[in-house]
Regions:
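Eukaryotic partner-binding/assembly regions in large regulatory complexes
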Residues: 1-115
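Short acidic, hydrophobic short linear motifs in intrinsically disordered regions
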Residues: 26-32, 119-133, 142-146, 151-184
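Short amphipathic alpha-helical interaction segments
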Residues: 38-46, 186-203
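A short, conserved structural fragment
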Residues: 50-59, 198-213
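Minor-groove-contacting beta-hairpin "wing" of winged helix-turn-helix DNA-binding domains
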Residues: 63-67, 214-220
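Short, amphipathic alpha-helical interaction segments positioned at domain boundaries
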Residues: 78-82, 169-186, 203, 222-249
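Low-complexity intrinsically disordered segments
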Residues: 208, 217-225
Length: 249
């Protein structure tokens, strides 16, 4: 298909804006937003450039987002980069997967996947979140131990939970972190580890971390992602199975 030069130029302008800002809001860039939403050829060109750059271009509400795919280390974050930002010095894979589990737990506490909006609460206290993490890790580790014991009786050693989550490894990594009730920001403490994750999520525009009140709120950006893209019922039920949450809990 042959595209008009003006459409190509406009699509490049939109894509460059997305590369720089990762989002394009109607109220801030009305002309570019209108071109994307009302001109099919412009939208197709922008999406094509996104595909070449290993990203998806999606619109939720009145905002257009550039979302790097999971394996996009250039526009997104590599495992090594995340480990460096979120975990203590010399962190292992156990520490990295623990950080991802913390984020998953945070999402589940905010979103229940029910109704017209998946959001279930407006905020969570940091202390409550820390208790949730400890509780879910312990429950998961207990289930894994029971499953491994049952499989040992059947001569099937080395089994993990059904979803393949190594809860005992993450539990060990979490227990290796010191507790500090003085508000330490060191990543070698449970409080500092959680603080680093919350600061990272805030920098990505996904949460509002009110440190003086020890409170976490979600942003409209995260709400949109969860409602429109990430948290359909299939994804939600799988996440709840991983965390070991039953229907009547």
């Amino acid at each position: 298909m042959a595209y008009e030069l003006e459409a190509i130029r406009t699509s490049q302008e939109i894509f460059y804006f997305l590369l720089e800002h990762h989002e394009l809001r109607e109220e801030e860039e009305a002309q570019l937003y209108k071109a994307y939403t009302e001109q099919e050829e412009v939208q197709n060109l922008v999406k094509s450039q996104g595909e070449i750059a290993g990203s998806n271009i999606d619109r939720y509400g009145n905002v257009i987002y550039l979302i790097p795919k999971e394996d996009n280390d250039f526009l997104g974050f590599s495992k090594a980069q995340l480990k460096s930002v979120l975990c203590k010095s010399g962190a292992t894979d156990k520490d990295y997967y623990l950080s991802q589990f913390v984020i998953l737990t945070l999402l589940v506490e905010f979103y229940d996947g029910q109704g017209s909006s998946s959001k279930a609460r407006e905020y969570i206290r940091v202390g409550e979140l820390q208790n949730c993490i400890s509780s879910r890790l312990k429950e998961g580790a207990d289930r894994q131990t029971e499953a491994e014991a049952a499989d040992e009786e059947e001569k099937k050693p080395g089994a993990k939970t059904q979803e393949g989550i190594a809860f005992t490894d993450m539990m060990q990594a979490y227990e290796a972190l010191r507790s500090d009730d003085k508000g330490s920001r060191a990543k070698t403490t449970k409080e500092g580890f959680l603080h680093a994750i919350l600061v990272f999520l805030e920098k990505q525009g996904l949460i509002e971390y009110v440190e003086q009140d020890e409170m976490v709120k979600t942003t409209k950006k995260l709400d949109n992602f969860m409602d429109w893209n990430l948290l359909n019922q299939n994804h939600y039920k799988r996440v709840m199975r991983i965390l070991g949450v039953t229907e009547d809990e």
